[in-house]
Regions:
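Amphipathic alpha-helical segments
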Residues: 365-370
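Basic, amphipathic alpha-helical recognition segments used for DNA target recognition
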Residues: 66, 318-363
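Residues immediately flanking
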Residues: 1, 48, 95, 202, ...
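Polyanion-binding catalytic cores of nucleic-acid enzymes and NTP/SAM-utilizing transferases
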Residues: 140-319
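Signature of N6-adenine DNA methyltransferases within the class I
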Residues: 1-190, 307-317, 354-361
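Flexible loop/turn segments at secondary-structure boundaries
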Residues: 1-3, 50-54, 80-81, 206-207, ...
């Protein structure tokens, strides 16, 4: 039996469409196309997640360079199969040079029951020039607007790595505290004030603003209080120093010792100490001390908020920190135009919520202003 690392290595060597988080059905497209003869056609019914997901990027590029797509049907969130909850697509392709994408969306059972007529009446040709990112299937007016946005002049380009994830504690009830506990911990040891940070949680968010319910984070990075990048793995020396120098905090967290030790078992007590945050964002901790724009990963109200300096961010939220553009970005991201744009290129929940992953938000077209 192959271990996971070897398994992934072999797949990456054999398939150009494979990435570490690819769904295996993507590999069947490439293998099927390789096996086709000159006049053969390939038809697959699969999940439609490849159309917009990050892992589908390699597959979309493969189609653009290796295939002629005859028909693509996106059923969006329409549930076609009675015994399988899956968002579905159908694609028919053959070997050859990619031409314009001939595709249509089907969003109701009535359209599905008259499939041939629906394909004829709703199919739209999409230019290759706007298929560099997620594939969008829509009417001509929407595609024209999308193309204008994608080729917006004087754009602000933020690097993908500037978009950050919030801190993952692994056990919120241990690390997220209220004002009462904060005051007790600081009263017993004044230096704890440097460890306890104001934090923003997802349930604090309104549109454009947030409720300050006085939540605080006990910020304990790996190997705290030692600051030695050479430390590999959980350090008993770090724990003993933490117990000695921050006894009140140590005793408080020790009340959760059993639950904290049962977090990610492949890392807790191995890569980091039982009392440390699971993901402390140590490589970009300075961003928490800047103005920020924050939003929920599962964003059901299209909420983006301005977050002042010194607020830390919890894992249900993503954010981007920028001293100059933060307030401007809140207005841009919150606009109806960008809400519409997301619906074209992003992924939605079945209840209409927005799956606001970093990979989608980081691709938003933003107009530069001086």
């Amino acid at each position: 039996k192959l271990d996971d690392k070897t398994y992934k290595k072999r797949l990456s060597e054999q398939f150009t469409v494979y990435s570490g988080n690819s769904d295996l059905y993507c590999l069947f497209f490439e293998k099927g196309n390789d096996l086709l003869n000159k006049n053969g056609c390939l038809a697959f019914i699969t999940s439609n997640k490849w159309l917009k997901s990050m892992y589908g990027d390699l597959l979309r590029n493969y189609f653009l360079n290796k295939c002629e797509i005859i028909t693509l049907i996106d059923f969006k969130a329409l549930q076609i199969f009675k015994k399988a909850s899956v968002d579905t697509s159908i694609i028919v392709s053959k070997k050859g040079d990619f031409k314009n994408l001939n595709a249509c969306q089907i969003e109701s059972l009535n359209e599905y029951n008259n499939l041939e007529d629906t394909i004829k009446s709703k199919s739209i040709q999409t230019k290759k020039s706007i298929l560099s990112g997620p594939w969008v299937i829509n009417n001509k007016e929407s595609l024209n607007l999308l193309e204008k946005l994608k080729h917006l002049e004087n754009r602000i380009f933020f690097k993908r790595e500037q978009f950050r994830y919030g801190i993952k504690t692994g056990l919120n009830k241990a690390f997220l505290i209220d004002d009462k506990i904060k005051k007790i911990l600081i009263q017993h040891d004044k230096k704890n004030i440097d460890i306890i940070k104001p934090v923003l949680k997802g349930d604090n968010l309104n549109r454009f603003s947030f409720n300050s319910n006085k939540h605080f984070l006990i910020y304990i990075p790996w190997h705290f209080p030692l600051h030695n990048e050479g430390i590999k793995g959980a350090s008993n020396k770090a724990e003993q120093k933490f117990k000695k120098d921050y006894k009140i905090l140590y005793d408080y967290l020790f009340k959760f010792h059993s639950e904290l030790s049962k977090r990610n078992k492949s890392e807790t007590g191995i890569s980091y100490e039982w009392y440390a945050l699971q993901r402390a964002a140590s490589t970009y901790v300075n961003d928490f001390y800047k103005p920020k724009v924050a939003w929920m990963n599962m964003n059901r109200g299209w909420k983006f908020v301005y977050v002042p300096k010194n607020y830390f961010i919890e894992a249900s939220l993503n954010f981007i920190a920028d001293d100059y553009y933060a307030k401007y970005l809140v207005g841009i991201y919150s606009s109806n135009l960008h809400k519409w744009y997301f619906k074209q290129v992003g992924r939605m929940f079945d209840d209409g919520g927005f799956m606001c992953k970093v990979d989608t938000i980081s691709g938003f077209p933003i107009k530069y202003f001086a």
